[in-house]
């Protein structure tokens, strides 16, 4: 899910930047530090916003710069296990598909795609079910559930695993067709109820 997190930090303003708009300098400093960060607590940092730099700074002996406290907000994406999310397929491989969810690509392994034997057509870049003939390719929109999350360990960019092997998950087109089939089945199985005391003529 996307979140707006409010934080406090301190920034260093070097002497050559004295006289510039302090919030602009603060924004540049925070952008360098936080933009693109992947953190176990924050998740994926997308943007820095709402910056308020304290105009009264401190000087440390031996350093001509000033240090200022700053309040700011981070727009983050924090994937949670069991969360259902929609995304776009951005790459197809023999072992599965990569799905763009928020600012990151999650792995949809072939074993988690559908209840069917899946073949990979490398030339067409398609994963296809043997029995269902359902195809998945780049550009398709899917609904998936997050099953595994690993963030910011050892300076990595994090990993996310997702599944589509549950009811109402998978390619959006498949879900629509499944819902239509269910609605049609319900209409067929419905029988007109007879009122009490009614009898055949």
Task: Show which residues each predicted segment covers.
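Single-stranded RNA-binding regions, centering on S1/OB-family and related RNA-binding modules
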Residues: 1-201
